[in-house]
Amino acid sequence: MVIDNGYKTSASRIAAGMWNPILFKKLKKSWRADDLLPALHRTYTELEELLDKKFIYDREIVRLFPSNDAANDFHLAAGDERYSDYLEDKPQPEVEAVANDEFGYGTIKGGYVDLPVFLPAFREYLKSKDSFLESEFNESDIQFNASGVCWNGYEAQKIIFANGFKTIESAYWNYLPLTRTHGNLLHVQAEGLNL
């Protein structure tokens, strides 16, 4: 059973849904990229089939180099077999048309999940299986017993909290050394950039 209050500004609703296997600043692979990205593709491809919707897309991320050193580091990494699945340093005409940068650019093989398509489709699927409840979730209503957990008449063996930034306020998790962070929204409009 998924319990969700439909919070309009939850991270899932406003996130871009992007994945990027490379840390830009240090030009290193993201943690467990070699394991997690194949699992991401496999899982979302299966969900596309289940929901009969298209919502996972591969998309290259353009990295403009701030210096010759950054360009050299990128080209060296792109030639390294450990990074070859993620980095591309071949010229691309559609990028060349808009990227007027003296040190050049490289591309990172990333992508995104179209969350405005995925989230409502998955929500409807869960509703069709009687596995979704739109409701506030109050931790004080949780009761633990020998067979698992009970909440407002629903019983389960386990409970998974997916509270996002509200985890800090949780009576169960407030001891964790978490700090609030925030993302930024950036809307880009550029003539000739046909992505």
Predicted regions located by residue number:
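Short, glycine/charged-enriched secondary-structure capping and boundary segments
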Residues: 15-18, 34, 77-79, 173-177
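N-terminal Rossmann-like FAD-binding beta1-loop-alpha1 element of flavoenzymes
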Residues: 1
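Flavin-dependent oxidoreductases
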Residues: 144-195
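Flavin (FAD/FMN) cofactor-binding and adjacent substrate-gating region
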Residues: 46-133, 141, 145
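Residues that flank catalytic or metal-binding motifs in active/ligand-binding sites
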Residues: 15, 58-60, 181-184
